[in-house]
Amino acid sequence: MRSVIKVLELKNASDVVTIKKAISNKTGVLAIQINIEKREINVVYDDYLLTVNDMVDCIEDLGYSIL
């Protein structure tokens, strides 16, 4: 499954590293690509192991707001 998550506070390389590290550690994540300009996270994942809500919760736990 592929999902696009929009993050309000995604502004710099440090944000990319923080979010990428947290999401990549989730079981079921196959690929992740982050676009700072669009404030988007594109995630390919196994929807039997993980839901988009699991990833949203993870990002929000880091202090970011989801659009």
Protein language model features and the residues they cover:
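Short amphipathic alpha-helix segments
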Residues: 11-25
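Short glycine-/aliphatic-rich beta-strand segments at the starts of folded cytosolic domains
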Residues: 1-9
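Short amphipathic alpha-helices in soluble, non-transmembrane regions
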Residues: 18-22, 54-61
